UniProtKB/Swiss-Prot annotation:
Changing residue 559 to Y: Abolishes catalytic activity. The keyword Transcription regulation applies. Residues 78-267, 293-464 form the Macro domain. It is found in: Nucleus. It comes from Homo sapiens (Human). This is Protein mono-ADP-ribosyltransferase PARP15.
Length: 678
């Protein structure tokens, strides 16, 4: 089924090539029989016998030493939105960097000469994959002529994929019909190749939208149309291809919006298959899209896809739903109540009967009215790691492929959410170390309390090889507890609001500034409304309030900067990786001054070409502090015998502080930007 909206006739031409014809334009791909005979196939995954042997070997190896290395935990994947075709093909909009994306197949864009490194996409591929990728691509040049529209297949080398499809994409040429047709055929070839080689997932970056000038909105419309068409008319019912990913870079708002618009257009005529989370909604009801405001996270742990997202577990469509309940299996509150009420009275009655009989640490009932096959009821107060391990083993024994569970024990049982997140992921790692090719493919934690999303994300990052990657997440606006005095953001995640002179808010900030900077002239004061940064800061504040057993952890401080840094700080906050730009005397963190006069120095708030200077008024979580020293990269421990209990910040003088240094990016929120002149 094609996505709504007009497309040039060439893009959906009834005379499009057949799958067999399409395959002739792919260097490195032979027929199924040919692949089985081919001794030197570029992709072992394409040879069924080799693939089975590889699996047996992998299984023996894992069973022999029972080791599970960190490399088996792939990068966290930021899923902005997802939809499913009526034929069951899952489409996901992914935000991130191509270097840290994982899938069976990833598509790359290459020039006519097939030399990697010319554009940002192929340069990124070459950077991570290594020189062998170029060597394999050079070998493929001898098999197929180099012309626009052809694709060349290589292995993934050091990328987190089994294969790369390198496409020679067309120039936009002001929308010439041939450009549409060539790009459409490239997409068809990629989908057909994945189908023929029995891969299960493919990731499409926005190829052609850089120097080749394909408009992003046009590309989004075209590729979704082709994928829908493939799903409805070409893809077999038993197809191994289960997921198609559309990748946009983290800060590419235009590309993200283009896909969200197309997702929404399609979902309006297929509402039962849509899963496009909107502002103020965690159930996927379609509304007007402005920017993504909900996030699910995914990462690969061995053969398991681990997901975490806020939502209602009672609406999950999976094989197994886990109900975290009391030891007596009769709790009817919170998430457990939602599950039992959704399942129906018959399930509740059966649960009571089974609870009265001898049973294991959990009991199993049918799914009832829920969209699952069974419900596993577990006591939330028990050891979470052991409980989750038991659930996963039960799913595997029954050959189920998917399970959704809550953040077990974080409700009435009162367990520490950080410990729970670690325990759940540890259990999945344990399971993956024992099962190299399990039936169970997807484990999802559905979070009722949105504030737990960051906690699970932090736990995932501990196992993420690319933890240094700066993912900007998106959250439901209703979960951010935005300040009441903020201007309506119209579902946007970020905006700047200029304060009017004479307003009480303006006067408060002005007075704080002029207390030590009376000789400077204020040009304007702007309030920074950044929902994501505010959410991250508030989560950190709540953690610190609990840890220190009081709420007196916050100060309003100053930070001077240059004009070039302003856009970055407004959008992303203070990044300690920039530490050392102006000061490192008390540690390699971000520095904030008690008095505005300190930050007003030209060393810190460097004047721009027009003489304007810039200073932030910042909420900073200073908490419990101590004196800093050069070389610190984190605050020192409060007690040398307990190295994990750190001070929250450091200062120049504990009795009379003039400045504070923090070492974690979400420990400061830039609330106001003052533009001034000397």
């Amino acid at each position: 089924m094609a996505a709504p909206g007009p497309l040039p006739a060439a893009a959906l031409s009834p005379g499009a090539p057949t799958p067999r014809e399409l395959m002739h334009g792919v260097a490195g791909v032979t027929s199924r029989a040919g692949r089985d005979r081919e001794a030197g196939s570029v992709l072992p995954a394409g040879n069924r016998g080799a693939r089975k042997a590889s699996r047996r070997s992998s299984s023996r190896s894992m069973s022999r030493d029972n080791k599970f290395s960190k490399k088996d935990c792939l990068s966290i994947r930021n899923v902005v939105a997802s939809i499913q075709t009526k034929e069951g093909l899952n489409l996901k909009l992914i935000s991130g960097d191509v270097l840290y994306i994982w899938a069976d197949v990833i598509v790359n864009s290459v020039p006519m000469n097939l030399q990697l490194g010319g554009g940002p996409l192929s340069r990124a591929f070459l950077q991570k994959a290594g020189p062998m990728l170029q060597k394999e691509l050079d070998d493929r040049r001898r098999e197929t002529e180099e012309k626009v529209g052809n694709i060349f297949m290589t292995s993934g080398c050091n990328l987190d994929c089994k294969a790369v499809l390198h496409a020679v994409a067309p120039y936009w040429n002001n929308g010439a019909e041939t450009s549409w047709q060539i790009m459409a055929n490239i997409i068809k070839k990629c989908l057909t190749t994945v189908e023929v080689l029995s891969f299960s997932s493919i990731t499409f970056p926005m190829i052609g939208t850089g120097s080749l000038q394909f408009p992003k909105a046009v590309f989004a419309k075209l590729i979704l149309s082709e994928v829908f068409e493939y799903s409805s008319s070409t893809r077999p019912i038993t197809s191994p291809l289960q997921e198609v990913h559309f990748l946009v870079y983290t800060n590419d708002d235009e590309g993200c919006q283009a896909f969200l618009d197309e997702f929404t257009n399609w979902s309006r005529i297929n509402p039962n298959k849509a899963r496009i989370p909107m502002a103020g909604d965690t159930q996927g009801v379609v509304g007007t899209v402005s920017k993504p405001c909900f996030t699910a996270y995914e990462m690969k742990i061995g053969a398991i896809t681990f997901q975490v997202a806020t939502g209602d577990i009672a609406t999950e469509q999976v094989d197994v739903i886990v109900n975290s309940t009391a030891r007596t299996f009769n709790r009817k509150s919170g998430v457990s109540r939602a599950i039992l009420e959704g399942a129906g009275q018959a399930v509740e009655s059966e649960c009571a009967v089974l609870a009265a009989q001898p049973h294991r640490d959990f009991i199993i009932t049918p799914g009832g009215c829920l969209k699952c096959k069974i419900i596993i009821h577990v006591p939330g107060g028990k050891d979470v790691r052991k409980t989750v391990t038991s659930v996963l083993e039960e799913c595997e024994q029954r050959k189920y492929t998917s399970v959704s569970l809550p953040a077990i024990g974080t409700g009435n049982a009162g367990k520490n959410p950080i410990t729970v997140a670690d325990n759940i992921i540890d259990a999945i790692v344990d399971f993956s170390s024992q099962h190299s090719t399990p039936s169970l493919k997807t484990v999802k934690v559905v979070i009722f309390q949105p504030e737990l999303l960051n906690i699970f994300y932090d736990s995932m990052k501990k196992r993420d090889l690319s933890a240094s990657l700066n993912f900007q997440s998106t959250f439901s606006m209703t979960t951010c507890n935005l300040p009441e005095h903020w201007t309506d953001m119209n579902h946007q995640l970020f905006c700047m609001v200029q304060l009017e002179p004479g307003q009480s808010e303006y006067n408060t900030i002005k007075d704080k500034f002029t207390r030590t900077c009376s000789s400077y002239a204020i040009e304007k004061i702007e309030r920074i409304q950044n929902a994501f940064l505010w959410q991250s800061y508030q989560v950190k504040k709540r953690q610190m309030d609990i840890k220190n057993d009081h709420k007196n952890n916050e100060r309003l401080l100053f930070h001077g900067t240059d004009a070039d840094s302003v856009p970055y700080v407004n959008q992303h906050g203070f990044n300690r990786s920039c530490a050392g730009k102006n000061a490192v005397s008390y540690g390699k963190g971000t520095y904030f001054a008690v008095d505005a006069s300190y930050s007003a120095k030209d060393t810190y708030s460097k004047p721009d070409s027009n003489g304007r200077k810039h200073m932030y008024v910042v909420r900073v979580l200073t908490g419990v502090f101590t004196k800093g020293r050069a070389g610190l990269v984190t605050p020192p421990p409060k007690n040398p015998h307990n190295p994990t209990d750190l001070f929250d910040s450091v200062t120049n003088n504990t009795r009379s502080p003039k400045l504070f240094v923090v070492f974690f990016d979400n420990q400061a929120y830039p609330e106001y930007l003052i533009t001034f002149t000397a």
